[in-house]
Amino acid sequence: MAGNDRNSASTSSFRSHEEQSDSLVDPSWELIDPTPDVHAMFLQFNDRFFDGALAGCEVRWSPRMTTCAGLCCYEGRGGLCSIRLSQPLLSLRPRKDLVETLLHEMIHAFLFVKERNRDHDGHGPHFQSHMHRINHIARTNITIYHSFHAEVANFKQHWWRCQGAC
């Protein structure tokens, strides 16, 4: 029950601050909601930007994904898809990066659900149209690619080969 209370409080906090500020990435969010509930954000964003079209989509943290910040996986029949967010890359980044990564992946999910677009790397005109629309409304800076290169490099696994007697 405590988890539900936290989700309700997080959603309530999100709604009340959203009414005061049009920007989803306003710096004050870092103090108001520094560790947001991604599921609550997903539901809010789905209603606000995608007319509820992503009801068949799930969002979850990936504890081992370190080569990208987010990924949208298409589950096939029925328009089901899953958004995975990199817990290692996003958990220590500003809230703004989580919001923009989630919205980026939600655009991919929306294009799949509405147009059956299965191009995971597709950032063409339809993607960019939605990206610009949301950036304008929410004052975000959703981009085609993230800039977490230092973090990705930090998580890269290195294989060492012994060149002498081991």
Language-model features, listed with the residues they occupy:
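Active-site recognition of the HExxH zinc-binding catalytic motif
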Residues: 100-113
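Solvent-exposed, charged interface segments at domain starts and junctions
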Residues: 1-2, 97-100
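Mixed-charge, low-complexity intrinsically disordered regions
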Residues: 1-3, 8-9, 13
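Metalloprotease/metallohydrolase-associated module, dominated by Zn2+-dependent proteases
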Residues: 11-97, 113-166
